[in-house]
From Swiss-Prot:
Catalytic activity, reaction form: ADP-D-ribose + H2O = D-ribose 5-phosphate + AMP + 2 H(+)
Function statement: Plays an important role in virus replication most probably through its hydrolyzing ADP-ribose activity in host cells. May function in viral DNA replication or transcription directly, or by removing toxic substances or metabolic intermediates.
Organism in which the protein naturally occurs: Autographa californica nuclear polyhedrosis virus (AcMNPV)
Database matches in InterPro entries: NUDIX_hydrolase-like_dom_sf (IPR015797), NUDIX_hydrolase_dom (IPR000086)
Cell compartment(s), UniProt: Host cytoplasm; Host nucleus
Ranges annotated as spanning the membrane: none
Main location: host cell
EC numbers, comma separated: 3.6.1.13
Keywords recorded for this protein, A-Z: Host cytoplasm, Host nucleus, Hydrolase, Metal-binding
Keyword Metal-binding: yes
Name the record gives this protein: Protein ADP-ribose pyrophosphatase ORF38
Domain of life where this protein originates: Viruses
A Pfam family: NUDIX
Amino acid sequence: MRNAAGLFMIIEPDKAVLLCARRAYRSANAPAADMNDTFLEKISIPRGHRDCCDAKVYETAVREFVEETGRFFDSAFIYKLPFTLQWKDDGVTYKYLIYVGVVRGNLINVNAKPNTYTVKLLPGTFGNDYRIMLKPRRFNCEIARSLAIVPLNKYFNYMNDKQLITYDYSNYIEFFDFVRSVKARFDNRQLQDFFYATLKKIDNDAPQKLHALRRV
């Protein structure tokens, strides 16, 4: 489980940053007549698995957020304790550590199509300040998803009415309560429960330039 994490970001005052897909993985190789098969996770939280460069669990969550949405935040408050989200779908149990955060300001476009690149987080001066570097990805097995920014209550209602009924089991209801609790803590300025993180995009050749300058 520590190798899988996601980031549920809220844009003030009450909108969630999500992904929207139109078809299922199982439809990828199906005949054309079957391409309208329902995707059981039509609306999903940006998430993924740890890679060798992720030193901390929340770094996996942040990196996957940037890779899957094609956006990054200039700064955000992220709740220190993640929620263990799990569900069982078609006999398979999924489990992710989901961090909940609040974006300060706007999301910034990385100017690249989601999942066509990998992200490397380079630590900055402070512990949760990162520079992000993009590297083209040679292969992409992800299905196409688009960015969906929707009101929190609309997302909760959609999940309750359309998506959760397709699962054998899930603790999404508890997760929704967790999100509400985190948002209430933020609104009440209980910022000691959050850590402050910043991201800054750099050119791919910036580290080489910096290294060259240091040698002069």
